[in-house]
From Swiss-Prot:
The active site is at E257 (acyl-anhydride intermediate). It comes from Campylobacter jejuni subsp. jejuni serotype O:2 (strain ATCC 700819 / NCTC 11168). One of its GO terms (molecular function) is 2,3,4,5-tetrahydropyridine-2,6-dicarboxylate N-succinyltransferase activity. This is 2,3,4,5-tetrahydropyridine-2,6-dicarboxylate N-succinyltransferase. It catalyses: (S)-2,3,4,5-tetrahydrodipicolinate + succinyl-CoA + H2O = (S)-2-succinylamino-6-oxoheptanedioate + CoA. Keywords: Acyltransferase, Amino-acid biosynthesis, Cytoplasm, Diaminopimelate biosynthesis, Lysine biosynthesis, Transferase. Belongs to the type 2 tetrahydrodipicolinate N-succinyltransferase family. Pfam families: Hexapep_2, THDPS_M, THDPS_N. Succinyl-CoA binds at R259, G274, S277, A300, D315, A316, G323, K349, R362, Q363, D364, S365. Pathway: Amino-acid biosynthesis; L-lysine biosynthesis via DAP pathway; LL-2,6-diaminopimelate from (S)-tetrahydrodipicolinate (succinylase route): step 1/3. It is an enzyme of class 2 (transferase). Catalyzes the conversion of the cyclic tetrahydrodipicolinate (THDP) into the acyclic N-succinyl-L-2-amino-6-oxopimelate using succinyl-CoA. The lineage of its organism: Bacteria, Pseudomonadati, Campylobacterota, Epsilonproteobacteria, Campylobacterales. One of its GO terms (biological process) is diaminopimelate biosynthetic process.
Length: 386
């Protein structure tokens, strides 16, 4: 029986000293949306609280709850997912007895809510021991939450194989519906006027279905940001041609009116113009993830296919690709901004210029030549809008 905080700390020590025990890197409890036809198929996992490299005592109590009822836990595996039973919650709350009347213990508060709302097979405990290729839908969602809540940096977590594990489903008011269910019940649903309004069909939900952004972040259309994106405070996502994919986003306040593809990152103070595209790792970059530096301007309908440093401009309507050849101007001034780069020729391929600062990519309107020169303009966002 745990009656004091000293008892609790002793229990945690005993659990963590068990042979093979490993502290998880991340853990949380998810509410599950299961398939309408296949109840074993997980369509979505929603987390209200994510723990990342913290609250190890809470993790130890939950893992001990499962071991108490005979669940085998492989601490050498990369992840552990277990459906919650009411007895698990009761055991955990009994261990947390010295803290039950105190404020500020979010994991305890969450358990109290789940106990009140408990239904069989609706909640799962999910933890990651190592960052390896995900093995379950629940662990994919945990990783997407880690990205979207900015607990881990973009491109720092393994999502290989996620597409293969997630089901392609219909989404109605942010709830997933099996396409097989709709086909099997189409006549009944339509003839009884119960056919759901389908908002979209995809493997990923929308960012705003799971994440509450900062007060100074604006997203003008929910469809424009996929779950797993990361938006820094002060970012504005305009309607129209804007889009931010999973494992992509901004690291500071930005204006986004174009497309930030998967694995692309945009730095603070940059402006992605209307219809501009930043290529992702699957769209013409030879697998090279693109980062756009601080205070850059990607003109309307431009295409950026190489990493950019700070204070760069890509003029409207042009494509800066790895193989695009550019005539270099202002070499002496550019060398001062990029002292570790040797500007020793007149013609460069785009890929050779990756990551350099102060570049202005443009096209000569008479000759048609692609030119890269010193950026002599300051890119500054309207502070009133961010």
């Amino acid at each position: 029986m745990i009656n004091t905080k000293e008892d609790f700390l002793l229990l945690i020590k005993q659990i963590e000293q068990k042979s093979g025990y490993k502290k998880p890197k991340a853990f949380g409890i998810a509410r599950l949306d299961r398939g309408q036809l296949n109840k074993n198929k997980i369509l979505q996992a929603s987390f209200a609280l994510i723990n990342y490299e913290q609250n190890f005592g809470s993790a130890a109590i939950m893992l001990e709850a499962f071991m108490q009822r005979g669940v085998e836990i492989d601490f050498n595996a990369s992840e552990f997912v277990q459906t919650l039973k009411l007895e698990d919650i009761d055991f955990a709350l009994s261990c947390f007895k010295p803290f039950l009347e105190e404020d500020g213990h979010q994991n305890i508060d969450l358990l109290k809510i789940i106990k009140d709302k408990f239904k069989d097979d609706e909640f799962s405990f999910v933890c990651l021991f190592e960052d390896k290729e995900p093995l379950s839908v629940e662990s994919i969602y945990l990783k997407l939450y880690l990205l979207s809540t900015k607990k881990v940096p973009l491109r720092s977590i393994n999502l290989n194989g996620a597409f293969g594990l997630l089901s392609n489903v219909a989404w109605s008011d942010d709830k997933p519906i099996e396409l097989e269910y709709l086909r099997a019940n189409e006549m009944r649903l339509k003839m009884s006027n119960q056919y759901p309004k389908i908002d979209f069909v995809d493997k990923f939900p929308r960012f705003l279905a799971h994440i509450i952004p900062e007060d100074n972040t604006r997203i003008l259309e929910s469809s424009k940001v996929r779950m797993g994106a990361s938006l820094a405070a002060g970012t504005t996502i305009m309607p129209g041609a804007s889009y931010v994919n999973f494992n992509a986003g901004t690291t500071g306040a930005c204006m986004v009116e174009g497309r930030i593809s998967s694995s692309a990152i945009v730095g603070e103070g940059s402006d992605v113009g209307g219809g501009a595209s930043i290529l992702g790792v699957l769209s013409g970059t030879s697998g090279n993830a693109i980062s756009v530096g601080k205070a850059c301007l990607l003109g309307a309908n431009s295409v950026t296919g190489i990493p950019l440093g700070d204070n760069c401009i890509v003029d409207a309507g042009i494509a800066v690709l790895e193989g695009t050849k550019f005539l270099l101007k202002d070499a002496e001034e550019l060398a001062k901004l990029n002292p570790y780069f040797n500007f020793d020729k007149e013609i460069y391929k785009g890929l050779e210029l990756k990551g350099l600062n102060g570049l202005h990519f443009r096209q000569d309107s008479i000759s048609g030549a692609m030119i890269v020169a010193l950026n002599k303009k300051a890119v500054k966002l309207n502070e009133a809008l961010h």
